[in-house]
Amino acid sequence: AQMRQSSLYGSELSIRGIEVLAQNMTCPGNDDIEMLQRYEYDKSDVQSWAEYIWTSMYANISNANSVLSADLVKQAKDFPYTTYKGEALALRAFMHFDLVRLFTPQYTTTQPQTTGIPYQTEFSLKTPDFESLQKNYDHILADLLEAERLLKVQPIHDYDASTAFMNDRQSHLNLYAVWGTLARVYQTMGEKEKAVAYADSVITKSPYRLKEKTEVVGDLAGVLSEKETLFGIYYADFYSTVSELLQKRTFYQSLDPRSDFMLYYERESLPLDYRTSAYFTQIEAGGQYFYRLSKFTDIYELNNIAGSRPSQLILGINLLRLPEMYYIMAECLLETDPVRARACYNEVRTHRGLSALPEESALTQDLLDLEFFKEYFGEGQQFFRYKRLNQPIPSHDAKTTYPASSKIYVLPIPNSEYANRY
């Protein structure tokens, strides 16, 4: 599947468009970017951008369905068919879920019978009908739960030359990534107990562990985090995209972080938040210094020493990481088990070099929001978080806010989707 293409997770749903919608990134003078950050969904250029995402995602969903329809695979000698099928089902659910998050109202703030999207379950030229938002989620959960049943516990870093498909499990939607996706979906649906159960399974039953604070630098720099990535996409050329959009400031599409981003990080307090220097650097351009989001810049490519990169590192894009599981638990337990919620919150903080929240201090939604912002800046998740919580979005220049509404949170479904039905 070409999930790494620029219209999807190679750019628009990771570091570019979706981060512009979150007001995390901006590009002064670029009309396309400025229309996006003003949520001008009636403009043809923005509608074309949304259609770009829509059609690309469904093309990839079709690829997953092609795998699921390939009966010959079942007869292949020594081929791990149940794993293959489980991953394809999980990918189908993962991609539909992101389309739902983009193109439909938030589940918890609308009626279940609100119109959703077409859920494509067959490899066919026939376009499936639109269905209700409730049915969308029913389909997503059905695919994920069947994937959970099919997938077996797999080592993450084992290499077996006889079955290459089973290598590099982080770049596959493995069992632990299915659990993580289920936690994400259930939280979006407001099903807190189920979200906690799956997030806890990832934390307690998977081999993933939070990296130490001294490991933060470079851990996401064009590679999948060895310790924290539940699922990511292999993408050998991600550096060229990151270099043009994030590292440089000479390209007409180059993105600047929001004006006040550093105020979110506790730079002036001790102990130090290790993410600050790991995620951002300053460059000089025209006699001025500018911050760049260097979180994903491959330091081996940047320094022309790609041959020195440790062989076990997987080049690519991180789509689901372990800290989110702690944040899901902390938020979902905030009212019912505040002690456990604080413990989850503190676990990530201390692994990023910060002090734990004292027992006498109450953990609040605002503190959780702040911590999520700092951890996931640039990773394409902040817009979805604002939407799920029905929060206003502070503008990139910190001068105003955009009130929460479907006008900003629901992208326009392409007109071509209605025109091509038969």
Predicted regions and their residues:
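TPR-repeat structural position
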Residues: 137, 192, 338-339
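Acidic, glycine-rich segments characteristic of secretory precursors and extracytoplasmic regions
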Residues: 1-19, 416-422
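Short, surface-exposed recognition loops and adjoining beta-strand edges that mediate ligand/DNA contacts
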Residues: 11-22, 105-113, 156-245, 362
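Short coil/linker segments at helix-helix boundaries
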Residues: 102-139
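Inward-facing hydrophobic residues that define packing positions of alpha-helical scaffold repeats
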Residues: 61-64, 68, 137, 144, ...
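Conserved, well-structured interaction surfaces
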Residues: 33-103, 130-134, 151, 312-317, ...
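Hydrophobic-face positions in mid-chain alpha helices that act as interaction patches
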Residues: 172, 196-318, 322, 361, ...
